[in-house]
Amino acid sequence: MSLELLDAVPLTSLSGVGAAISNKLAKIGIHNLQDLLFHLPIRYEDRTRITLIANLRPEQYFTIEGIVQTCEVAFGRRPILSVSLSDGTSKIMLRFFNFNAGMRNSFQVGVRVKAFGEVKRGRHMPEIHHPEYQIVRDNAPIVLEETLTPIYSTTEGLKQNSLRKLTDQALALLDKVQIAEILPNEFNPHQYSLKEALRLLHRPPPDISLEMLEQGKHPAQQRLIFEELLAHNLAMQKVRLGTQQFSALPLHYQTDLKQRFLATLPFQPTNAQKRVVSDIEQDLIKDYPMMRLVQGDVGSGKTLVAALAALTAIDNGKQVALMAPTEILAEQHANNFRRWFKPFGIEVGWLAGKVKGKSRQAELEKIKTGAVQMVVGTHALFQEEVEFSDLALVIIDEQHRFGVHQRLMLREKGEKAGFYPHQLIMTATPIPRTLAMTVYADLDTSIIDELPPGRTPITTVVVSEERRAEIVMRVKNACVNEKRQAYWVCTLIDESEVLEAQAAEAIWEDLTKALPMLNIGLVHGRMKPQEKQDVMMRFKNAELDLLVATTVIEVGVDVPNASLMIIENAERLGLSQLHQLRGRVGRGCTASFCVLMYKPPLGKVSQKRLQVLRDSQDGFVISEKDLEIRGPGEVLGTKQTGIAELRVANLMRDRKMIPTVQHYAKSLIQKYPDVAESLIRRWLNNKEIYSNA
């Protein structure tokens, strides 16, 4: 039997595993023997040696032995059993908050005890609370572990000891089988066999470097981390290659439409925009679907890039669909494209949840017959009732939360007569390069790394909420004297939407009393979409001076006259989200300000994070720092398809390995396609997300 087949060996083949234990193991993702072997320890304890009490250090785990000096029960609100031991070098106190008479009687003065636990500082001597212990009888030798003791992530009702016993059985089975090494030597830079790596990591020898293990730096760990990242990358490459097996209509400009459109604009595209448009045009002339991600910082001009991509399809007599995450943003896009495209007789339709009844039916008919060449909307565009006449390009805006699976579904939606639409995905949330190389390995990536001229930098200040009165006066000055508009953003992270709405309403009431001369609007997540839309449009049309809002405005309308933003409890938000919010101002040519208001005292980490935002306007620098501080799951806003399942690797810790992995993956999938399939099966277990590719 080879390890490739171990995923077919049921857990019930192990002694002691019945239905109840199987169900508990399933809760932690263990369904077969291979899962069990890949369920590696999260840390280790050294129970292989006795440490003298005099040499103990607080906040670390040790095995000690000593003779009982005293055994006392302190009766208070809850009784505590305290046992002092001495080994001749010093003393230590063992404390038990849950105990019975049998335990108390076993600690007779003069008895020898072996104990293991975390050492804490005590008033008179070090202490261990609730240690694991053993009474050593009649000078019997003390039995110590031969390897480091693994600690696994587990679930209720599944003890560490049970997991260790099951792993011991799996390792014993591993010794009996011939394991075919899937990875060719030239693709294994760490030179550990899989068998050696698994054995060492489940049962490390006592002389191993614990520090290396804790940091994920041991060659045995690196071997598995490398292979897992390689498998994920191969799976994404497979999606990419799979896409190239599909047919798409090559789109060349048929007329001078692009030149005529550019001539109507009051500005010139930046060099970065021209470069990205060129990337897109090179993709669109191919006979397989484009899958391109365009990253551009807030205000970098992604909409113009989308317009030029759309015109290529429209010039070929085809349809374009643009999907935005909110109705507000979708309507803004629809209005922009109508304004830009009207001189050329191009019809732009829009479809969202609020378009109902006869209007909806009329819009659906236009889409079906091709009367509209471009359709803008929310995810409503991809409901079953929507039929496109001849869809050749799908543009997804602000959808970095889309996983591979959704991208594949969109491809299927636009299929017609064996041809599939090209896809352009745009995000204003800069994704750290290492993350993009992993999460978006199935996409080609372009970056708009230049802001249009005339954009003024935003001055960011970090202020304690104790200075709230000053800030309110600053808002008054901006709105009354400078005739500008302002945002006041309330945040209640990890609270319910109800509480967040109540907090926003309370702040709106306070500001309405403090600033009676201003027209103040309110937007929060509990409002109906139409109510939110109406308030946002009033703000856009300058009927409101100040908008009190929750983070629903992170992706929102373009209001060039808004030049001041106050963000309450800024320390509670991630850096990338703060950067997105800040991007709502600084859209005109007036100097703009963002005030990050925090609740004191501010911890060191929060201080450091807010300083990053104060000192940098570069979304890519900010996203790298955000990744360091919060990790990949948080930065992406959701556990990404294909990333959430990492068992051994850690994207933050192991990010330096990713470029090497990507290099190996490209070579391996060409030279050894069968090996690539085996690796994907081993680590991803043929997950559904890749089966359509």
Curated annotation (Swiss-Prot):
Keywords: ATP-binding, DNA damage, DNA recombination, DNA repair, DNA-binding, Helicase, Hydrolase, Isomerase, Nucleotide-binding. InterPro entries: ATP-dep_DNA_helicase_RecG (IPR004609), DEAD/DEAH_box_helicase_dom (IPR011545), Helicase_ATP-bd (IPR014001), Helicase_C-like (IPR001650), NA-bd_OB-fold (IPR012340), P-loop_NTPase (IPR027417), RecG/Mfd (IPR047112), RecG_dom3_C (IPR045562). Residues 283-448 form the Helicase ATP-binding domain. Its EC number is 5.6.2.4. A motif (DEAH box) lies at residues 397-400. PROSITE patterns: HELICASE_ATP_BIND_1, HELICASE_CTER. It is an enzyme of class 5 (isomerase). ATP binds at residues 296-303. It catalyses: Couples ATP hydrolysis with the unwinding of duplex DNA by translocating in the 3'-5' direction; ATP + H2O = ADP + phosphate + H(+). Residues 482-628 form the Helicase C-terminal domain. GO terms for biological process: DNA recombination; DNA repair. Disruption phenotype: Greatly decreased growth rate with many dead clumped cells in rich media, higher sensitivity to UV light, no change in the spontaneous mutation rate, no change in the rates of slippage in tetranucleotide repeat tracts (i.e. phase variation). It holds the Pfam family RecG_wedge. CDD domains: DEXHc_RecG, RecG_wedge_OBF. SMART domains: DEXDc, HELICc. GO terms for molecular function: ATP binding; ATP hydrolysis activity; DNA binding; DNA helicase activity. The wedge domain within the N-terminus inserts into the replication fork junction, where the lagging and leading strand split. Monomer. Belongs to the helicase family. RecG subfamily. NCBIfam families: PRK10917.1-1, PRK10917.1-3, PRK10917.1-4, PRK10917.2-2, recG. Plays a critical role in recombination and DNA repair. Helps process Holliday junction intermediates to mature products by catalyzing branch migration. Has replication fork regression activity, unwinds stalled or blocked replication forks to make a HJ that can be resolved. Has a DNA unwinding activity characteristic of a DNA helicase with 3'-5' polarity. Involved in genome maintenance but probably not in phase variation, which contributes to virulence and disease. This is ATP-dependent DNA helicase RecG.
